[in-house]
Structure formats: C-alpha cells, structure tokens
C-alpha cells in the first residue's frame, strides 16, 4: 500500500493522462468536469492505469472537493 499526492486538472482541453510532477506528486489531466465526482472517477481510472493496478485498488483518501488529493493504492 502506498499513498500518492495528486493535483487534478479537470476540463483539460489538450490531453488526458498522468505525469510525475515536482516532489513525486502526480499531475492528473482529465477531460471530465469537476461535477458530481466525474473528475474524481476519471482520476482514479487514470492513476490505476499509470500504476498498472485495478480501479478497485485505488481509493481517494482526502480531497473529495479539492483539486489537491491523496490517493491510496493497494498493490
């Protein structure tokens, strides 16, 4: 199990994906809007793909209504 800090960039016009930012934080670009948890669901999917894990092994711990989030990944 590891915890990952991520910054979510919803409504991305140019791409969708995960890049490693400064200090080991992830920057997650998603085309989904930050409405009704759609950006959170897309971020979970993209982080799971980035770490080659299943979606069920990625949990949002902190930051449900913020662009700064902490995810827990069970491997």
Segments predicted by a language model, with ranges:
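Contiguous, often N-terminal, cationic amphipathic patches that form binding interfaces
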Residues: 1-37, 41-44, 53-55, 59-75
